[in-house]
């Protein structure tokens, strides 16, 4: 795989100490450099931080027939905001409609839908709401809900929603499990796996 830098962070397992976004002209230059050199099979976005960067990604990717996986990174584990308010609006209105898969956790899904999500019925409503923005698939990660297990709910257009359950990992020493999960989905899609298979196999890394 390869990457395009959208922002730099000064952080550790305790929190984020600084965020330094890439310039608006650097991101498309870097993205085009990667696209021109590699036959990309899938692309994942992570922390985009501001609206300019979101709109840059949209302007490039909307003309490409490359599966786009959006991990809507908004809030760091320690509580720091990783996506500005205008960027959140741009992500919802412009990036998600051109995405293939979106992988919000519960707080991110609440921001994107404007709903309070505490029950299975509310998760179902949120998933359907997000699918209606134009994506093929939404994975709502349930790790923020109470319970012994972390339960993710998968919505694929035209199919019945299903759940994936794993033992909850309790640790203060690591973060980034959501990013790892979305990266694994991207890798499986890049291998040519169907959406459902790609998501299930990506989740198996956490069992």
Predicted regions and their residues:
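Short, well-structured alpha-helical segments that form the helix of a local strand-helix-strand
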Residues: 123-131, 194-207
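Short, small-residue alpha-helix embedded
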Residues: 111, 171-195, 199
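Conserved N-terminal subdomain of the carbohydrate kinase-like
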Residues: 1-77
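Conserved phosphate/ATP/ADP-binding segment of small-molecule kinases
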Residues: 85-161
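Nucleotide and nucleotide-moiety/phosphate-recognizing core
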Residues: 52, 59-62, 159-161, 195-197
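Short pre-catalytic strand/loop immediately N-terminal to key active-site residues, enriched for Gly-Thr
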Residues: 160-175
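Active-site-adjacent loop and "lid" segments of alpha/beta metabolic enzymes
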Residues: 3, 12-26, 78-85, 91, ...
């Amino acid at each position: 795989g390869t990457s395009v830098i959208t922002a730099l962070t000064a952080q550790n397992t305790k929190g984020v100490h600084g965020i330094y976004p890439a310039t608006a002209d650097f991101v498309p230059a870097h993205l085009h450099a990667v696209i021109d050199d590699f036959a990309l099979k899938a692309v994942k976005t992570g922390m985009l931080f501001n609206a300019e960067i979101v709109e840059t990604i949209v302007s490039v990717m909307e003309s490409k027939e490359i599966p786009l996986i959006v991990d809507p990174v908004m809030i760091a584990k320690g509580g720091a905001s990783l996506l500005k308010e205008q960027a959140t609006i741009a992500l919802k209105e412009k990036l998600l409609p051109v995405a293939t898969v979106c992988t919000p956790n519960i707080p991110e899904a609440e921001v994107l839908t404007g709903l309070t999500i505490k029950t299975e019925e509310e998760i179902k409503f949120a998933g359907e709401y997000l699918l209606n923005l134009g994506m093929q698939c939404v994975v709502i990660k349930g790790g923020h809900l109470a319970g012994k297990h972390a339960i993710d709910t998968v919505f694929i257009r035209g199919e019945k929603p299903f759940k994936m359950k794993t033992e909850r990992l309790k640790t203060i020493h690591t973060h980034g499990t959501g990013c790892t999960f979305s990266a694994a989905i991207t890798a499986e899609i890049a291998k040519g796996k169907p959406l459902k298979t790609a998501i299930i196999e990506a989740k198996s890394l956490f069992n």
